[in-house]
């Protein structure tokens, strides 16, 4: 079941449980804590199986016309089951209902790490387009690829 999560403590609990289970993508403790903290003030869409979250994503406004897919995670045991796509479809509808024109997402550039190559292919498969590469936004080992989608 995919649903919106409004409760601040539940948002942070879900974010912590999913991100700490995905160290290949979220292995920097300070960054993970930042995602957990910021999730409290973002729109959260989560996937549940028997009342237990197995995935989530958060949307954050970055401009009056643009929302960012700020963070997303699906437990590895649930990868390739359509959960990420289903959550994104709901988030995309929510963004359109809030009159946003664009949705963006940032990830590590394709070709740097196998896990992030999977992430890049996922976003491209959803219909995102390459917008800009910012090689020094994070650090030289993690060049930031920005993808964008028109709503």
For each of these PLM feature ranges, what is it?
Residues 120-132:
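Conserved acetyl-CoA-binding loop of GNAT-fold acetyltransferases
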Residues 95-114:
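Conserved GNAT acetyl-CoA-binding A-motif
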Residues 80-97, 118-121:
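Conserved acetyl-CoA-binding loop-helix of GNAT-fold acetyltransferases
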Residues 65-76, 80, 104-106:
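Conserved acetyl-CoA binding element of GNAT-fold acetyltransferases
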Residues 46, 52-60, 66-73:
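Conserved beta-strand in the GNAT
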Residues 114-119, 133-143:
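Short glycine/proline-centered loop/turn elements that form peptide/ligand docking sites
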Residues 1-30, 48:
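Short amphipathic alpha-helix that is part of the acyltransferase structural core
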Residues 23-49, 56-58:
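Active-site rim helix/loop that mediates acceptor-substrate recognition in acyltransferases
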């Amino acid at each position: 079941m995919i649903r919106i999560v409004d409760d601040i403590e539940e948002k942070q609990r879900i974010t912590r449980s999913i991100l700490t289970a995905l160290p290949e993508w979220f292995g920097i403790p300070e960054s993970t804590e930042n995602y957990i903290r910021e999730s409290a003030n973002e729109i959260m869409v989560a996937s549940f199986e028997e009342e237990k979250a197995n995935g989530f994503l958060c949307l954050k406004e970055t401009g009056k016309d643009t929302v960012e897919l700020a963070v997303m995670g699906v437990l590895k045991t649930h990868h390739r089951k359509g959960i990420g796509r289903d959550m994104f479809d709901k988030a995309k509808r929510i963004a359109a209902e809030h009159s946003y024109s664009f949705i963006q997402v940032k990830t590590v550039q394709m070709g740097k790490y196998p896990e992030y190559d999977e992430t890049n292919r996922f976003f491209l498969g959803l219909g995102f387009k390459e917008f800009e590469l910012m090689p020094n936004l994070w650090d030289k080992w993690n060049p930031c690829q920005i993808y964008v989608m028109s709503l």
